[in-house]
C-alpha cells in the first residue's frame, strides 16, 4: 500500500522518510530533492540594496543513502537523473551511485536528451542492480511506471527467496 505524506522542506522529508521507512518493505526514493539548501533561513523579505548577493548553501541529507543504512532497511530504490557531461556512460555513473548509496536498485535516465524526461510525456531509463542492468526503451511515462513496478516486484521476490 502506498502512502503519501506532504512535507515542506528536504529536512522534513528526511525525518519523515527515516521514520516511515523503518515500517516498510519497499522504499522508492523518487522525489527530486534539492542537493543543497540555503545555510541561513530568512523570515523577512531581502531588500534590494545592491546589484549582487551571496547566498551560502549547505548540503541536504541524502535520504536514499540514510534509508539504505537503516538496520532493518526496506528494499530501497533510487533514481538518478544524469546529464552526459563526460565520456562516462549512464550505466557506470548510476552503478557507482547504487554502490555508494547501498541501494538495491537504481533507475537512471539521461536528462540531457530533450525528447525524454523533464517536459516530456516519454522517458527511457536503465534499471541497475548489483548484478545486472536492463534498458527500458522510450515509452510513455505511464507505461514505463507499470514496467518499473513489475521490475521492482520481481527484484523483491528474488531478494525474499535469498533470505
Predicted feature locations:
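A cross-family phosphate/adenosyl-ligand binding-site feature
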Residues: 1-163
